[in-house]
Swiss-Prot record:
GO biological process, one term: sodium ion transport
Family: Belongs to the NqrA family.
Name listed for the protein in its UniProt record: Na(+)-translocating NADH-quinone reductase subunit A
EC number per UniProt: 7.2.1.1
Signal peptide: none
Membrane spanning residue stretches: none
Catalyzed reaction equations: a ubiquinone + n Na(+)(in) + NADH + H(+) = a ubiquinol + n Na(+)(out) + NAD(+)
Record's keyword terms, sorted: Ion transport, NAD, Sodium, Sodium transport, Translocase, Transport, Ubiquinone
Free-text activity regulation comment from the record: This reaction is tightly coupled to the Na(+) pumping activity and specifically requires Na(+) for activity. Inhibited by korormicin and 2-N-heptyl-4-hydroxyquinoline N-oxide (HQNO).
Upper taxonomic lineage: Bacteria, Pseudomonadati, Pseudomonadota, Gammaproteobacteria, Vibrionales
Species per Swiss-Prot/TrEMBL record: Vibrio alginolyticus
């Protein structure tokens, strides 16, 4: 077991009940283009086209051969683009059950399948995009390979579902997915979990590792740091546990599996719980009559790293397993800094709220202050469990010093790895955005 002591479990109200329920009927689904780092689409459909489930919607011209497929059958009703014609989303009005089918196999055949057969089926179905590289967090090139694949079979994000509930419901598919991953690499498959019991693969290159401690103990970046540190030469891939199930379902049934169990939770959700929906589901449909009155912000993903789901982005993200909802914090409190703050959370124990152990807080979207200078008072070190100098690294990200940032470990990181640093920052800096700018520059300059 690997135990980390630094980190932070956010005490936010609205914890979901850990029972899986059926979600609302979904009328629209979408693929969100901006989720895929560096992707430049070549469109295969236009508005008005009828599509089958698993039909190709677009390919990536910067990563030749990588296909992005429809999560449901229906009619393309929107192709939304932003500044500089960046693809925001392809929206499908759900209708019918037609789907593209693929080869299916017996469970005993999976570990012996040829690697090219596996790659071809994953690419054609669109499931290849479930894999992400580290560094850079991009969809792997089809001809690339890795010696380490990390399966994130735990989740320490605030308000998250317990993965063991979902995995144990789909044990056969999960084991089949691990068998597929084991055949996809000449190295090891690291299944990273909490102390719970999960179905195990019989393949010799599949290892289980237990992590314990506060968030970010459940992040792929934390697991890689301790088990297979990445750099420009050592490239690892990561995948979440629900996509491992989808891999198994694809090869066992010959059909694309797009079901997703998500946590619908937060301080303004009427009945926080786990709901079964589909990848790309309209969050307007999913949250209909589920929220308390007032102005709220629906977030696809965690409250720490998710995206504001509004307009062309109001859909469940490809890599997200949560829908979090917060109240918009627009009210201003006179002399709020001088109040005892019984109902306020503070990492630095600035408010009385820290005295009441176990208290959950109705957090909002407010940043509790305006932008200001970066102040190194030890906050970053409290929440960074990785063996690096967070204050120096964050300073270099602010200054745009890519050489120094790379030397301090920036290539190991993804935006989610710096989310707690953003949360505890007195200067209100968005370190995830700064990290992405740094990584883009490093990749561009080689």
């Amino acid at each position: 077991m690997i135990t980390i002591k630094k980190g932070l479990d956010l005490p936010i109200a609205g914890t979901p009940s850990q029972v899986i329920n059926d979600g609302k009927t979904i009328k629209k689904v979408a693929l969100l283009g901006e989720e895929y780092v560096g992707m430049r689409p070549t469109m295969h459909v236009r508005v008005g086209d009828e599509v089958k489930k698993a039909q190709v919607l677009f390919e990536d011209k910067k990563n030749p051969g990588v296909k992005f497929t429809a999560p449901a059958a229906g009619k393309v009703i929107e192709v939304n683009r932003g500044a500089k014609r960046v693809l925001q989303s392809v929206v499908i009005e759900v209708a019918g059950e037609e789907q593209v089918t693929f080869d299916k196999f017996e469970a005993a055949q999976l570990s012996g399948l040829d690697r090219e057969v596996i790659k071809t089926q994953l690419v054609d179905s669109g499931l290849w995009t479930a894999l992400r590289t580290r560094p850079f967090s991009k969809v792997p090139a089809i001809e690339s390979s890795t010696k380490a694949i990390f399966v994130t079979a735990m989740d320490t994000n605030p308000l998250a579902a317990k993965p063991e509930l979902i995995i144990n419901e789909q044990q056969e598919a999960f084991i089949a997915g691990l068998d597929i991953l084991s055949a996809l690499t000449e190295g090891k498959v690291y299944v990273c979990k909490s102390g719970t019991s999960l179905p195990r693969s019989s393949q010799s290159n599949v290892e289980e590792h237990v992590f314990d401690g506060p968030h970010p103990a459940g992040l792929a970046g934390t697991h890689m740091h301790f088990l297979y540190p990445v750099n420009a030469e050592n490239v690892a891939w990561s995948i979440n546990y629900q996509d491992v199930i989808a891999f198994g379902k694809l090869f066992l049934t010959g059909e694309l599996y797009t079901d997703r169990v998500v946590s619908l939770a937060g301080p303004v959700v009427n009945n926080p719980r786990l709901v079964r929906t589909v990848i790309g589901a309209s969050l307007d449909d999913l949250t209909d009559n589920e929220l308390m009155p007032g102005e709220v912000r629906v977030i696809s993903g965690s409250v720490l790293t998710g995206t504001h789901a509004t307009g062309p982005h109001a859909y469940l993200g490809r890599y997200h397993q949560q829908v979090s909802v917060l109240r918009e914090g627009r009210e201003k409190e006179l002399f709020g800094w001088a109040m005892p703050g019984k109902n306020k959370f503070s990492v630095t124990r600035s408010f009385l709220g820290h005295v009441f152990k176990g208290q959950l807080f109705n957090m909002t979207t407010t940043t509790n202050g305006s932008d200001r200078s970066m102040v190194p008072i030890g906050n970053y070190e409290r929440v960074m469990p990785l063996d690096m100098e967070p204050t120096l690294l964050l300073r270099d990200l602010c200054a745009g010093d890519t050489d120094s940032a790379q030397a301090l470990g920036a290539l190991e990181l993804d935006e989610e790895d710096l989310a707690l640093c953003t949360f505890v920052c007195p200067g209100k800096y968005e370190y995830g955005t700064l990290l992405r700018e740094c990584l883009d520059t490093i990749e561009k300059e080689g």
